[in-house]
Design a protein with these regions (language model features):
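Bacterial N-terminal signal peptides
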Residues: 3-15
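Preference for long, amphipathic alpha-helical scaffolds in soluble/luminal domains
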Residues: 18-360
């Protein structure tokens, strides 16, 4: 009897390891390479897009912004990513079933930019979840991409004028933030993704005639391509929290934008992204994984061909497997925000090669 009591006491005294927000969730022992870990969407091969879109629309605040969850304080980065999702699904500030939601998101971002007119000034107060993980400038970087994509789809008028002016200011802020090595951020948990979004913002701005410095884009490309070490044939991870997926996604996205998909970093990225362990990134699905899939899917779509077909099928199966019962996606580590992860996944699912229609 005494021995039994002592055994129970010892068992209770043994600490149980906890999985923090920074540590990956355990992988099931029967997990096979090439197949995502099963989840609520087990058995599905294509994600539901209608329910996550409805959730995202419902989660939008009265002021037009999105926070990490429904009915939470909004931030510019999450709002911009959610706005891009609406645009990609055909809901612009002036057309589409959910045009009013898109316009409210646009005006939320425009007002935030207008409140911070100095070129070096951040447009969002410090302390948001995207900032902590991707760096202080992520709001500006994503705002530029959202504004650039929105302006392209808007008719002439006051809204477009304000959006264009806000975009020009974001471009100034982004170029002021660029460092000597071509990066745009060294703070946050995985700043390489922030630099990838900064470059995306500049390209989106350039596409609609904003004043973007060619040297700034050249430096950004050089920085991202140097993230691949051709001698060791690996991706450097100093700016990607030790996760090669983030660096590879950034490099591949940049190569697609710059037209250098045949160069070594892009070729290596495509090869690595065919490996299940590599695609798992940190080991569980945080917002960083979701945006890495988004960046990679953009690049594969630009290239087209068999690589696109294989990647598209695999990423859609993966997102179907980890989709939650209510249709949303949520991060397992770091960027855990339902709004952020759901928006990123909707963008991924909306991406198609040129001249291929979007399907819902």
């Amino acid at each position: 009897m005494l021995i039994g009591v002592l055994v129970v006491a010892l068992l209770l005294a043994v600490p149980v390891p906890a999985h923090s927000a920074e540590s990956p969730a355990p992988v099931h022992a029967n997990h096979q390479l090439g197949t995502p870990v099963s989840g609520p969407g087990q058995g599905r091969t294509d994600p539901d897009q209608a329910r996550p879109l409805q959730w995202l629309l419902h989660a939008q605040g009265q002021d037009g912004g999105w926070g990490p969850e429904a009915n939470t304080k909004p931030d510019v980065a999450t709002t911009s990513l959610s706005g891009i999702a609406l645009l990609r699904l055909g809901h612009t500030p002036s057309s589409g079933e959910h045009r009013e939601s898109a316009r409210k998101a646009l005006m939320f971002v425009i007002r935030a930019v207008e409140r911070s007119p100095a070129p070096e000034e951040f447009i969002e107060p410090e302390g948001t979840l995207p900032q902590r993980k991707l760096g202080r400038g992520i709001d500006t970087f994503l705002a530029a991409q959202f504004l650039g994509e929105a302006v392209k789809l808007m008719p002439a008028g006051e809204d477009r004028r304000r959006a264009s002016a806000a975009l020009e200011l974001c471009v100034s802020k982004i170029q002021s933030a660029q460092r000597k090595d071509g990066s745009f951020s060294k703070d946050g948990w995985a700043p390489v993704l922030s630099s990838a979004f900064a470059a995306n913002g500049l390209y989106a701005a350039k596409d609609v005639g904003a004043r973007v410095s060619p040297s700034s884009l050249a430096k950004a490309e050089d920085y991202m391509m140097k993230g691949y070490d051709s001698e060791s044939k690996t991706f450097r991870t100093a700016d990607s929290a030790g996760v090669a997926l983030y660096q590879a996604a950034g490099a591949l996205g940049m190569a697609a934008r710059a037209g250098t998909m045949k160069e070594a970093p892009a070729v290596a990225a495509r090869e690595h992204l065919a490996d299940e362990a590599f695609v798992r990134g940190f080991g569980s699905y945080g917002g960083e994984e979701h945006v890495s899939y988004m960046l990679s899917t953009e690049a594969f779509a630009k290239a087209g061909g068999d690589d696109w077909t294989k990647w598209s099928k695999s990423i859609r199966m993966r997102l179907a497997a980890i989709q939650r019962e209510d249709g949303t996606w949520r991060g397992d580590h770091c960027i855990t925000s339902t709004s952020f992860c759901t928006a990123a996944s909707l963008i991924t699912l909306a991406i198609r090669p040129a001249n291929t229609p979007q399907q819902m």
